[in-house]
């Protein structure tokens, strides 16, 4: 009995380590925006089978992309305080195990999307995987301080994937959702990079605060926040959304702008940390308001 219990605990621990490779908190936001994209794509209810299979498929491929990131950056992760507890730096899983895991999970996700959703969603998701795992992680991130701006395109794709899963096409409204996340990505990550600047410098990662300094980065956090605010007003301007969304977006935008102005004028690491955390709530809140407005329109 005791032997069985120990074996079960060891198995559960191993499963947990592989689960951590998928960066579940990051993937949960990806899946959330993808699901919102599904609901926004139709006036009524999303077919249950499409909702389930698309969600699972997108989550699997996103998790595989996160595992690629962990695999490629394991030496960097071992140095940085924020990431040294991940499974690969700790040695709780090996590189070959990670590769097999991500291949199986990613392959399963693509198969689900192709066979049970539609080929367009599968190809768009594969393109997103390549954009994040290869173009961003392997090429852009260690090469240019504009990694977040250029690589942000892959991170902005989830609502487009959700939209395509339900409709089989990509519309202008879907691309507007893409633009929101694309504009959100730089101020979100640069807030993190500001208070983690020394760690990024230590591992030679050319994040904007490392290459161009704090003041330049703080200015760009503010500028990109203003761009983000302009983009978030577009769903109302194009009549994609109504007054509920407009009111919610304005409230969320004002708070984000407050953080951006404070970061520019009176910077502290704690302020940047708070701004980074708020930016996650901001994006989730913005898409939640989009969903509410979609079904309750004024």
Swiss-Prot record:
Locations listed in the record: Cell inner membrane
GO CC entries: plasma membrane
E.C. no: 2.5.1.141
Pfam families for this protein: UbiA
UniProt keyword terms in alphabetical order: Cell inner membrane, Cell membrane, Heme biosynthesis, Membrane, Transferase, Transmembrane, Transmembrane helix
Major site of localization recorded for this protein: membrane
Enzyme class: transferase
UniProt xrefs under PROSITE patterns: UBIA
InterPro entries: Protohaem_IX_farnesylTrfase, UbiA_prenyltransferase, UbiA_prenylTrfase_CS, UbiA_sf
Membrane-spanning segments: 26-46, 52-72, 99-119, 120-140, 148-168, 174-194, 219-239, 241-261, 276-296
GO molecular function, a single term: protoheme IX farnesyltransferase activity
Example GO biological process: heme O biosynthetic process
Membrane topology according to the record: Multi-pass membrane protein
Involved pathway(s): Porphyrin-containing compound metabolism; heme O biosynthesis; heme O from protoheme: step 1/1
Top-level taxon of the source organism: Bacteria
Catalysed conversion reaction: heme b + (2E,6E)-farnesyl diphosphate + H2O = Fe(II)-heme o + diphosphate
Protein family membership: Belongs to the UbiA prenyltransferase family. Protoheme IX farnesyltransferase subfamily.
Function according to Swiss-Prot or TrEMBL: Converts heme B (protoheme IX) to heme O by substitution of the vinyl group on carbon 2 of heme B porphyrin ring with a hydroxyethyl farnesyl side group.
Extra remark: Carbon 2 of the heme B porphyrin ring is defined according to the Fischer nomenclature.
Protein name in UniProt: Protoheme IX farnesyltransferase
Organism encoding this protein: Nitrosospira multiformis (strain ATCC 25196 / NCIMB 11849 / C 71)
Name of the coding gene: ctaB
């Amino acid at each position: 009995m005791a032997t069985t219990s120990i074996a079960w605990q060891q198995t559960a621990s191993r499963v947990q380590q592989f689960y951590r490779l998928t960066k579940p908190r990051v993937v949960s936001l990806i899946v959330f925006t993808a699901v919102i994209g599904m609901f926004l794509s139709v006036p009524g209810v999303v077919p249950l089978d499409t909702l389930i299979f698309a969600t699972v498929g997108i989550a699997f491929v996103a998790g595989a992309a996160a595992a690629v990131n962990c695999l490629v950056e394991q030496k960097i992760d071992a140095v940085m305080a924020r990431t040294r507890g991940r499974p690969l730096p700790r040695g709780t899983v090996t590189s070959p195990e990670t590769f097999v895991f991500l291949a199986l999970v990613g392959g399963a996700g693509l198969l689900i999307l192709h066979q049970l959703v539609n080929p367009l969603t599968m190809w768009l998701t594969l393109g997103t995987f390549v954009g994040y795992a290869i173009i961003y992680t392997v090429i852009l991130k260690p090469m240019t301080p504009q990694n977040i701006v250029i690589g942000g395109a892959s991170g902005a794709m989830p609502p487009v994937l959700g939209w395509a899963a339900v409709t089989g096409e990509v519309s202008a409204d879907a691309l507007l959702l893409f633009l929101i996340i694309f504009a959100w990505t730089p101020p979100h990550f640069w807030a993190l990079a500001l208070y983690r600047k020394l760690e990024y410098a230590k591992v030679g990662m050319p994040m904007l605060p490392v290459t161009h300094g704090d003041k330049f980065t703080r200015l760009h956090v503010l500028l990109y926040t203003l761009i983000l605010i302009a983009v978030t007003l577009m769903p109302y301007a194009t009549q994609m959304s109504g007054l509920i969304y407009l009111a919610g977006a304005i409230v969320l935008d004002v708070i984000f702008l407050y953080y951006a102005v404070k970061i520019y004028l009176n910077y502290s690491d704690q302020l940047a940390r708070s701004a980074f955390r708020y930016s996650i709530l901001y994006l989730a809140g913005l898409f939640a308001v989009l969903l509410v407005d979609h079904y309750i329109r004024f």
